[in-house]
Amino acid sequence: MFDKFIAAAAAFAASLAGAAGTAHAGKDLDAIKARGQVVCGVTTGGISGFMSVDSQGKWVGLDVDICRAVSAAIFGDSEKVKFVPVTAIQRFTALQSGEVDMLSNNTTWTLQRDTALGFDFTGVTYYDGQGFMVNKKLGVKSAKELNGATVCVAPGSTTELNLADYFRANKMSFKPVVIEKVDEIRAAFFSGRCDVYTTDRSGLYATRVANAPNPDDYVILPEIISKEPLGPVVRHGDNQFGDIVRWAQYAMLEAEEYGISSKNVDDMLKNENPTIKRILGVTPGMGKALGVDEKWVYNIIKQVGNYGEVFDKNVGMGSPLKI
C-alpha cells in the first residue's frame, strides 16, 4: 500500500515544481458547484472505521474523510457533502446514473471496472485482502479446513468471485448464503445461519470489534486470498472532477511527508521551504491548475487532516481497530 502512496506523493511533489496551467470546467464539477455539495456513495450498513454513522448521526470514517477532503478542495468547506448509502449491487448503477458523484466505499480497483464500466479510479486509500472469519467453537485454524462450510457473502462483488475461485483451486465445496446488505450479512453470521463470513480483512476486523456479541468468540483465519486495492471511483469523462479527487488524496499524503498536519498548518504557512509554500498555496498556481482556490490543500489539511492523521483516528492506533 505505502509503495503506491510514495509513488503518488512523488508525482505530486514533481508537479509542484512545474508550471501550472488552467483547468477547463467539466460538466460534473459544474453540476456539483451549482448544487452546492458533493454526493458521495458509501456502504449501506457501514463498516466501522471506514464509513459508519456515529451517535450524533454523523458519517465518520476513513472513506468518509476522503469525501470531506474533496468537499474542502472544491468549496473550502469539508461539510458540503451528502452521503448516500448504496449496496454492492447498487453502487455502480448509482454512479453511472449520476445519483452519486463519486464512490468512497471500499470498492476494489479492477481492470474490468476501470475499463468496461466507464469509471476512473483515482488512487488507493487502503490496500486490503480478502479473508475469512469463523466462530472459535467451529475449531477451524485454516481456510483449507472449510470444505462443505456455509459461507455468508455479498453479491456483485470481487469477494463473491474470489470465494468461488479459492474453493475451486483447493478442491473444496461450499454453500453460499448470498445477502445484499452488509448489516444483514452480519446478522446472519452472528445468528449462526452461516459458518463463515468472508469479506476484506479490514471489514472482518471492524465487524468483530463493532458488531460481534462477544468479539473474543470469533477468529479471523490467517489466509489472505486476494489483493484488494480500495479507493474512490468517479465517472469517466469529466477529467476535472476526477483530477480534484485524485489530487486531494495525493495532497493528504504529501502533507504527511512534509510534516504538515491539522495542528500546525497555520504555522506552516510561514515556512520558507519552496515546496511547502506551493503545497499550501502561499506561492500560487496549483489551485488554478485544478480550477479551485489556491488554499485548497490548506483547507483539506486544516479541516480534515493529512493521510496519517485520518488513518490513525479512524483505523489506526487511535481507533478501536488499531490496524
Regions found by a protein language model. Name each.
Residues D65-I74, K137-V140, K144, A149-T150, ...:
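Extended ligand-binding regions for polar small-molecule ligands
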Residues A25-S104, L290, Q303, Y307:
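Extracytoplasmic small-molecule ligand-binding "clamshell" domains
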Residues K33-Q37, S71-E79, Q96-V100, K137, ...:
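Sec-exported extracytoplasmic/periplasmic mature domains
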Residues M1-A9:
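Bacterial N-terminal signal peptides that target proteins for export
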Residues Q37-G49, W59-F75, T108, D128-E184:
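Bilobed "Venus flytrap"/periplasmic-binding protein-like clamshell domains
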Residues V282-I323:
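C-terminal functional modules
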Residues R68, A72, G76, K80-E145, ...:
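Acidic, polar ligand-binding/catalytic clefts
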Residues A14-A23:
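C-terminal segment of classical bacterial N-terminal signal peptides
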